[in-house]
Regions:
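Extracytoplasmic
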Residues: 25-59, 257-262
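Extracytoplasmic gate region of multi-pass secondary transporters
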Residues: 44-45, 237-296, 355-360, 389-390
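Helix-breaking motifs and short loop linkers at transmembrane-helix boundaries and internal kinks
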Residues: 56, 88, 109-115, 126, ...
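Conserved MFS/SLC helix-loop-helix module at the cytosolic interface between two early adjacent transmembrane helices
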Residues: 75-114
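C-terminal ends and interior cores of transmembrane alpha-helices
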Residues: 98-111, 319-336
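Cytoplasmic helix-loop-helix junction between adjacent transmembrane helices
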Residues: 119-158
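Helix-loop-helix hairpin linking two adjacent transmembrane segments in secondary transporters
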Residues: 154, 158-207
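A membrane-interface helix-boundary motif in multi-pass transporters
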Residues: 174-187, 275, 313-316, 395-414
Length: 441
């Protein structure tokens, strides 16, 4: 006679069921959106000569168009993250991806400096909420020990998306105009939005493909609901202020790699390379940076187990990253051969991006239910650095007669400032814990 399952045995049999792996689809969606975001963001840099020629734009006007994106991106970081905390990342990501994809396509129809400036500003306003809301989704869908790895993988592909945008843009421009190229890039967003809308839910338990064993593995992450942001706690938290400061100091040198680096490589007072060689070497920081993000994602959980504390492991990795970035940058100045100098600068970027997953992972752990707001405010500081750094760099070069060493020494010093922040950041205490108890690993 067959045994009937009793109420006591049914839960045991259910808990022994192998966990599904649906949570990893969140990482897949994050990676593809990060690549798409960087393609849409960087494409204009490589189409700029054609745009300037067609619209009759001066260098200063083209520079202002670049700044329009950075300014909007910085201004709308906190609202984008706050909306994710209030409404959930699903609704926000769907809306902002449609928004920025539309304005990517609209870029191809602009006819003047003013219209292009407005289009790129509105594009930046939409894309600003991307990474804070992906971080919010990670907070809800991933167990604590997998979050930094997910950030590392996401930022690796984001960097590599930027690195491979130049050949992609050149390929598209080989069979169409710059105007239709932006329409094509904008259309890619519709594919992502459709797939994401069909699969993603704010809470794992609302996705029928996630079984009970995986829900148990995810743990209390899935309970992160929406609520009023505790602005008082946010402003009074030392860790929050230091996360803001370290990200500004991390982003300031990084923007050299994606703004002034090609000019440095071609300048007679820099490396004096041809335009072709400069284009080849300029991708090194993006390529090496991607490996840095991946490395941090792979080693972070091991460091957590080795130290027994996410607070200590994040501090060790981040301090090492800042110190290495400063040291390799100084080393690159001492090397005469351009190839090996760029390898050293690539290692500075590698070290730079060791910090990235730790910073975003700490936003998830410190922010808790309010990870969207915290990560948005942190990323705002990074983009303010992106607004300031090119301006300061231009002033230094103009004041010193293109003395690039002054600029590079300043960047190395800025990295040292970031290293000083991390020993005082506590990644183990969440803002949404009323009793401020350290969060379990």
């Amino acid at each position: 006679m067959a045994l009937q399952a009793s109420p006591l045995t049914a839960p045991l049999r259910l808990s022994a069921q192998p966990a599904t792996k649906q949570r990893y689809w969140v990482i897949v969606f994050a990676v593809t959106l990060a690549i798409l975001a960087y393609i849409d963001r960087v494409a204009i840099s490589y189409a700029a000569p054609l745009i300037s020629s067609d619209l009759g734009l001066s260098r200063s006007e083209m520079g202002a168009i670049f700044s329009a994106f950075a300014l909007a991106y910085a201004l709308f970081e906190i609202p984008g993250g706050w909306l994710g905390d209030r409404m959930g990342p699903r609704r926000v990501l769907l809306r902002i991806t449609v928004w920025w994809s539309v304005f990517t396509a609209v870029t191809g129809g602009m006819w003047s400096f003013g219209s292009m400036f407005v289009a790129r500003f509105l594009f930046g306003a939409g894309e600003a909420g991307c990474f804070p809301n992906l971080t919010k989704a990670f907070t809800t869908w991933l167990p604590r020990q997998e979050r930094v790895r997910a950030q590392g993988i996401t930022w690796m592909f984001a960097r590599w998306g930027g690195a491979f945008t130049p050949p992609l843009v050149l390929l598209v421009l080989s069979f169409t105009t710059w105007r239709w190229a932006f329409v094509l890039f904008g259309a890619l967003g519709a594919l992502w939005v459709t797939a994401f809308a069909l699969w993603f839910r704010d809470r794992p338990r609302d996705n029928p493909r996630v079984n009970s064993a995986e829900l148990q593995l995810i743990g209390d992450a899935q309970d992160g609901g929406h609520g009023d942001v505790p602005w008082g706690k946010l402003i009074r938290s030392r860790s929050v202020w230091l996360l803001w400061a370290q990200y500004f100091l991390l982003s300031y040198p990084w923007y050299f790699y994606i703004t002034w680096l090609p000019t440095y490589l071609q300048s007679p007072t820099g490396r004096g390379l041809s335009a072709g060689d400069a284009a080849q070497y300029a991708v090194y920081p993006l390529l090496f940076g991607g490996f840095g993000s991946l490395t941090c994602g792979l080693i972070s959980s091991r460091f957590d187990r080795w130290t027994g504390s996410i607070k200590i492991s994040r501090r060790l990795i981040s301090c090492a990253g800042f110190a290495g970035a400063s040291a390799f940058l100084l080393l690159s100045m001492r090397i005469q051969d351009p190839l090996w100098a760029m390898v050293a600068m690539g290692m500075a970027s590698f070290s730079n991006d060791l910090v990235m997953p730790c910073a975003w992972g700490s936003c998830m752990d410190v922010g808790g239910k309010f990870a969207g707001t915290l990560s948005g405010s942190m990323n705002m500081m990074g983009n303010l650095a992106g607004f300031v750094a090119p301006l300061v760099g231009g002033f230094i070069l103009q004041s010193t007669g293109d003395n690039w060493n002054v600029l590079l020494y300043l960047m190395a010093a800025v990295y040292c400032g970031g290293m000083i922040c991390w020993p005082f950041i506590d990644s183990s205490t969440s803002l949404d814990c009323d009793d401020a108890r350290p969060a379990a690993m």
